[in-house]
Amino acid sequence: MKKQALLCMLLAGILMVGGCGQKAADPAADTTAQVTETSDSAPADKPDGAPGENSDKPENPPDGTPGNMDGKQAPPDGEGGPGGPGGQNSAPESYDAVSSFSEDKEESDQTYASTGKDESAVLVTSGASVTLNNFTIDRTSTDSTGGDNSSFYGTGAAALATDGALTLTGGTITTDAKGGAGIFSYGNGNVSVSDTTITTKQDTSGGIHVAGGGTLTASNLTVETNGESSAAIRSDRGGGTMTINGGTYTSKGTGSPAVYCTADITVSDAALSAENSEAVCIEGLNSLSLKNCTLSGNIPENEQNDCDWTVILYQSMSGDSEVGESNFSMEGGSLTSLNGGLFYTTNTESSFYLKHVDITYSPSNDFFLKCTGNANKRGWGESGKNGADCTFTADEQEMSGAILWDSISNLKLNLTSGTILTGSILQDETNAGDGGNGTCDVTIDALSAWTVTGNSTVSSLICKGSITGADGKSVSIIGTDGTVFVQGEGEYTITTGSYEH
């Protein structure tokens, strides 16, 4: 993206410089600086025709039908994001910061404080390599705007790296400002943070955040966020890479998952909790891998939703993520749902992989997996054409509940290596419009089993393992053309287009 002369003129007139912080010992760290950024670190252009505005979560469907008429985006659980101005389509030409580092520097036992509007406390630019040890960073502002510029480009983040390396060790970061992310890596920024406590209090204030291709590595953090659209682990337009090991990540606001993923994120040996939101949201061509983590979510009821979920993989076409396959992988650890169903995928291609996860279901346990179109009132795709194309692989996994699919979706369900499914597989055409040619193909290997709890419908069934009813009796397997493949002794029937055993 090229710099725009008009944008430069406008920004020169409106950007404010202010705040207080540690004075620099040399010009490498300028106090109360306004730093001009080149466009090299701007994210890739959004998909053609894809509008995009504000907050963690997208709104506008691919057919252009508007979502919220106020132009703001809202998270999937329907709790609207914060207010704030509409975002610009390219990175800002400059950032305000109290302590701006443009040359290599290491400092210890210092405090960096910011009180200015949309101002960072610490900013790393110009390829500098900066290390801060035993630090305190405080970002407080009553008039910061938040919104897209904070979500997409890091405006107003407490610690921001846009071009250079920032290493943070053994510190504390606190923010009380709209758009006050704890740590933000954007563009050519590369952040490494360890043994640090991060607390954010207002909206659009993620704990650790990447966008525009930024990179962030975190170890042994304690992160708490309290605002809306403030995921503890957050990413946004342009994505990036996050690698996280250990620590505790808690989000308390509505519309604030523990992890909001429009990037490639890997987390191991960490505790992840969303107290008023789904646990995980992944949009578009992005991935989340969890290993030996504890994960919990508690999505509130909301009239905009047609169901409640704990982990969602979807696509809104807002421009915040590239269209493509969303990937969720979880090995070991535990997953707890406090409300609604467990896994939901709609209006996207998606892939799930589960292995040895200890699952605690919500009291309602609405579904184990829902792979269907949607009637979400925000408009995720064209109604009747917004199904999912999903591959779900369970490896040495116990799982319970209903699996739902429809004729505008395609589901490949693979039970492998000793997996046990206790539940039913149902074709639910509620949100399928006039229908389509979607399929549900189930494969059960020789070591795996399906305990059937209700009459089920699939397109094809390959079973090298075992199928029994919850009543302990054999299950009838009947072709859609009336062919009797198996005459069971129990009350349950599986209807399938084809059967192989």
Predicted regions and their residues:
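Extracellular beta-strand/loop-rich repeat segments of large surface/secreted proteins
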Residues: D406, N410-H501
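Residues in short coils/turns that link rungs of repeat/solenoid architectures in beta-rich domains
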Residues: S114, R139, T175-A177, T200-Q202, ...
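Positively charged n-region of N-terminal signal peptides that target proteins for export
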Residues: M1-L11
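Acidic/polar low-complexity surface segments
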Residues: P75-A91, T136-T162, G180-G182, Y186-G187, ...
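Disordered, low-complexity segments in secreted/periplasmic proteins that are enriched in proline
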Residues: G21-E93, M317-G319, R378-S383
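C-terminal motif of bacterial Sec signal peptides marking the signal peptidase cleavage site
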Residues: L15-G19
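N-terminal segments that cap or nucleate solenoid repeat domains
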Residues: G81-S144, Q487, E491-H501
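All-beta strand scaffolds that present successive hydrophobic residues in beta-strands
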Residues: D104-D109, S129-F135, L166-G170, N190-T196, ...
